[in-house]
């Protein structure tokens, strides 16, 4: 399933919210869970992981009206560590959360280029526009300008090009002649010459629709006798290679891409908690069920079982509640 279909898949949602929702008792439950000495973490998990993002915003308003305190700030003061990070992530509206992740990836020394690539390469034109709007509202600066200031070279160019959101095309029309020409141009820009015309790769990967690119990849393999992925690996390196490969992966199958990201976060020693939290939170109301299905096919085990092996305590319980039952 490629990325252009992923946002109409209602069966992919793991967090659907409460059908008989009332923010008043939910806010009261959270207040009692954090009142006095100690915290009832399970009560917090039961409420916040089983409500939709829109419902959580209503709970926050009710909490403020009833108790005069900001719910997110109260949660920050009562919780700690990875569990706090996860619960606080749930309190952000989706686009504001992704704007925050992008801002955090660029603030301070160093840049988390993988986070920026992941978000920009996997979102639709409309989603990117909402993220850019939220970013400017929350941080008082342009996302595009901040990316330009924080990155350089061909990586900067591909990220800015992705922000333009030119890839979306739901009409389904593909011009076979143009697809063949693009494939020939990619071959001429890489495998056929000494060196690489990076801008030709960037232009085609960032401005063509997903359906069109799928046809380009087919034609390219016929011409080059190798996949577009193999050519990218041999012609580029570093963050530019990662960005190009991410575009290709998201074009071929978005759900497989996110399954791979989740596995990458948990494989080996240690856990990349930022990647794990971001992808589970951001996909839970979109297509996490579909991602779970692909995860099991790709790695021979369920996402839930991997979370159980790799995390612990309230953090683990909250993640499992968001992920839901296994397919």
UniProtKB/Swiss-Prot annotation:
<feature type="binding site">
    <location>
        <position position="310"/>
    </location>
    <ligand>
        <name>Ca(2+)</name>
    </ligand>
</feature>
<feature type="repeat" description="Annexin 4">
    <location>
        <begin position="253"/>
        <end position="324"/>
    </location>
</feature>
<dbReference type="InterPro" id="IPR037104">
    <property type="entry name" value="Annexin_sf"/>
</dbReference>
<dbReference type="InterPro" id="IPR001464">
    <property type="entry name" value="Annexin"/>
</dbReference>
<dbReference type="GO" id="GO:0005634">
    <property type="term" value="C:nucleus"/>
</dbReference>
<dbReference type="InterPro" id="IPR009115">
    <property type="entry name" value="ANX8"/>
</dbReference>
<dbReference type="GO" id="GO:0005737">
    <property type="term" value="C:cytoplasm"/>
</dbReference>
<keyword id="KW-0106">Calcium</keyword>
<feature type="binding site">
    <location>
        <position position="268"/>
    </location>
    <ligand>
        <name>Ca(2+)</name>
    </ligand>
</feature>
<dbReference type="GO" id="GO:0005509">
    <property type="term" value="F:calcium ion binding"/>
</dbReference>
<keyword id="KW-0111">Calcium/phospholipid-binding</keyword>
<keyword id="KW-0677">Repeat</keyword>
<comment type="similarity">
    <text>Belongs to the annexin family.</text>
</comment>
<dbReference type="GO" id="GO:0007032">
    <property type="term" value="P:endosome organization"/>
</dbReference>
<keyword id="KW-0479">Metal-binding</keyword>
<keyword id="KW-0094">Blood coagulation</keyword>
<dbReference type="GO" id="GO:0005886">
    <property type="term" value="C:plasma membrane"/>
</dbReference>
<dbReference type="GO" id="GO:0001786">
    <property type="term" value="F:phosphatidylserine binding"/>
</dbReference>
<dbReference type="GO" id="GO:0012506">
    <property type="term" value="C:vesicle membrane"/>
</dbReference>
<dbReference type="GO" id="GO:0016197">
    <property type="term" value="P:endosomal transport"/>
</dbReference>
<feature type="repeat" description="Annexin 2">
    <location>
        <begin position="93"/>
        <end position="164"/>
    </location>
</feature>
<dbReference type="InterPro" id="IPR018252">
    <property type="entry name" value="Annexin_repeat_CS"/>
</dbReference>
<dbReference type="GO" id="GO:0005544">
    <property type="term" value="F:calcium-dependent phospholipid binding"/>
</dbReference>
<dbReference type="InterPro" id="IPR018502">
    <property type="entry name" value="Annexin_repeat"/>
</dbReference>
<dbReference type="GO" id="GO:0007596">
    <property type="term" value="P:blood coagulation"/>
</dbReference>
<keyword id="KW-0041">Annexin</keyword>
<feature type="binding site">
    <location>
        <position position="266"/>
    </location>
    <ligand>
        <name>Ca(2+)</name>
    </ligand>
</feature>
<feature type="repeat" description="Annexin 3">
    <location>
        <begin position="177"/>
        <end position="249"/>
    </location>
</feature>
<feature type="repeat" description="Annexin 1">
    <location>
        <begin position="21"/>
        <end position="92"/>
    </location>
</feature>
<dbReference type="Pfam" id="PF00191">
    <property type="entry name" value="Annexin"/>
</dbReference>
<comment type="function">
    <text>This protein is an anticoagulant protein that acts as an indirect inhibitor of the thromboplastin-specific complex, which is involved in the blood coagulation cascade.</text>
</comment>
<keyword id="KW-0356">Hemostasis</keyword>
<feature type="binding site">
    <location>
        <position position="270"/>
    </location>
    <ligand>
        <name>Ca(2+)</name>
    </ligand>
</feature>
<protein>
    <recommendedName>
        <fullName>Annexin A8</fullName>
    </recommendedName>
</protein>
């Amino acid at each position: 399933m490629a990325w252009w279909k992923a946002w109409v898949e209602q069966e992919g949602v793991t967090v659907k919210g409460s059908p008989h929702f009332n923010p008043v008792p939910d806010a009261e439950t959270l207040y009692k869970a954090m009142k006095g000495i100690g915290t009832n973490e399970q009560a917090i998990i039961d409420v916040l992981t089983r409500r939709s993002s829109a419902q959580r915003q209503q709970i926050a308003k009710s909490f403020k009206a009833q108790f005069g305190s900001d719910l997110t700030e109260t949660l920050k003061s009562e919780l700690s560590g990875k569990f706090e990070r996860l619960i606080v992530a749930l309190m952000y509206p989706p686009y504001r959360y992704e704007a925050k992740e992008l801002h955090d990836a660029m603030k301070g020394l160093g840049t988390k280029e993988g986070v920026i690539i992941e978000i920009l390469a996997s979102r639709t034109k409309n989603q990117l526009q909402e993220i850019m709007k939220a970013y400017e509202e929350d941080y008082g600066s342009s996302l595009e300008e901040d990316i330009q200031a924080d990155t350089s070279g061909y990586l900067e160019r591909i990220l800015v090009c992705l922000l333009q959101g030119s890839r979306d095309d739901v009409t389904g029309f593909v011009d076979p002649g143009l697809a063949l020409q693009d494939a020939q141009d990619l071959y001429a820009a890489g495998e056929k010459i000494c060196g690489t015309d990076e801008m030709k790769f960037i232009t085609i990967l960032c401005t063509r629709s997903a359906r069109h690119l799928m046809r380009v990849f087919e034609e390219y393999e016929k011409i080059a006798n190798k996949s577009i992925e193999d050519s990218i690996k041999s012609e580029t390196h570093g963050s530019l290679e990662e960005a190009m490969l991410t575009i290709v992966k998201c074009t071929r199958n978005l759900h497989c891409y996110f399954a791979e990201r989740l596995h990458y976060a948990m494989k080996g020693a240690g856990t990349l908690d930022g990647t794990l939290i971001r992808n589970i939170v951001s996909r839970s109301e979109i297509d996490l069920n579909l991602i779970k299905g692909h995860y099991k096919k790709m790695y021979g085990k369920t996402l839930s079982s991997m979370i159980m092996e790799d995390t612990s305590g309230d953090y683990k319980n909250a993640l499992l509640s968001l992920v839901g039952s296994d397919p």
